[in-house]
Regions:
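Fold-level signature of zinc-dependent metallopeptidase catalytic domains
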Residues: 42-79
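Post-HExxH zinc-binding segment in Zn-dependent metallohydrolases
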Residues: 186-224
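Auxiliary, metal-adjacent structural segments of Zn-dependent hydrolase domains
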Residues: 72-144, 151-153
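Charge-rich, solvent-exposed alpha-helical interaction surfaces
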Residues: 38, 58, 66-69, 73, ...
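Short linear proline/tyrosine/threonine-rich motifs used for host-factor recruitment
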Residues: 182-184
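Intrinsically disordered, low-complexity repeat and linker tracts
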Residues: 3-31
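Active-site recognition of the HExxH zinc-binding catalytic motif
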Residues: 157-176, 203, 207
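Pan-zinc metallopeptidase signature
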Residues: 219-316
Length: 316
């Protein structure tokens, strides 16, 4: 559990409240353990988990790289087919232009050995386990799988697929270091994680790099919900997707909404709704999802409706 590794999870013992300090409520003490930072088990199981880029230097010691370094590493990598190289250089240009403060060293490290595999639908299904998949980044292999015979024109779905998979490659990195330790740098938190919500936020990050409005977004329903929520928030932006975990997002939602550990309840419901939709179960109990709509509506109205507004102003 997270508690048993408090120190290794990035909470120094001197930060813990003294036992005799009665003023600290138990919840607050507990909350200190809830945010995913890192777990360093290199001395026991030869594993290091980094959920928050504030701790990246536990894994990566080289200096930050320039855009030119990124372009060079893409050009030098023989496992990236030539047709993808200009696309990937363009992706890097946009990330550097739009998100100058995100941590990109894991991405640089991934790009050194990244392989892009053009495959058939059957081959893609074997790695993605998803019949609806158009592409897949497999962290354990550091490979992007995409369907063969696609043209990657800006504005097309296939263009979005490449940006989506590159965004996974930017955010997550699994590798073995020179001392034989397995290193996991990932958005998937220790204390909260699900696939649809993580995918939706990754999708939003990917399409935010376009210079046009993209309405047909992967994980559409969840993406739309997160788009509204993030636009309302003054304490979270898509930079934070790269720099922090999904648990951090939940914590920022709670802080923004002045809730006590409620965001993960909503995220769990959104995860269920996604799976119910594909299992054709959403009609069975539609009111089960009402808290999601209430939550998003309250955020939106709280942000945009002001006391004394006319109906016209409110509609605008």
């Amino acid at each position: 559990s997270a508690n048993s590794g408090a120190d290794s999870a990035g909470i120094d013992s001197e930060d813990e409240p003294a036992a005799e300090n009665e003023e600290v409520p138990e919840e607050e003490e507990k909350k200190a353990f809830e945010l995913d930072t890192y777990l360093d088990h290199r001395d026991m199981t030869h594993r290091l988990y980094i959920y928050d880029m504030d701790y990246i230097e536990k894994a990566i010691s080289f200096e930050k790289k320039s855009l030119q370094d990124f372009e060079e590493v893409i050009r030098q990598n023989p496992k990236i087919p030539d047709k993808f190289k200009p696309l990937m250089e363009e992706y890097c240009k946009r990330v550097f232009g739009k998100y100058p403060d995100v941590e990109l060293r894991p991405f640089y490290q991934n790009l050194q050995s990244l392989e892009v595999v053009e495959c058939t639908e059957d081959e893609l299904l074997k790695v993605s386990w998803d019949v609806y998949s158009c592409g897949c980044y497999v962290k354990s292999e550091n490979k992007i799988y995409v369907l063969k015979d696609k043209e990657y024109e800006e504005g097309t779905w296939d263009y979005q697929v490449i940006f989506h998979e590159l965004s996974h490659c930017l955010r997550d990195s699994h590798y073995t270091d020179e001392d034989g330790n397995k290193v996991y740098i990932q958005f998937a938190g220790l204390n909260y994680y699900d696939v649809p919500n993580a995918e939706a936020i990754n999708s939003l990050f990917a399409v935010s790099l376009f210079d046009y409005e993209e309405n047909d977004i992967a994980y559409q329903m969840q993406s739309n919900a997160h788009k509204i929520m993030i636009e309302c928030m003054d304490n979270y932006s898509l930079d934070d997707y790269v720099n922090h975990s999904l648990g951090y997002y939940a914590k920022q939602l709670d802080e923004y909404n002045q809730d006590d550990n409620y965001a993960t309840t909503i995220l769990t419901l959104m995860d269920e709704q996604y799976h119910d939709y594909y299992d054709e179960k959403t009609a069975e109990n539609p009111e089960k999802y009402y808290p999601i709509y209430d939550y998003i509506s309250n955020m939106y109205l709280g942000k945009h409706l002001k006391a004394g507004m006319s109906q016209e102003e409110a509609r605008g």
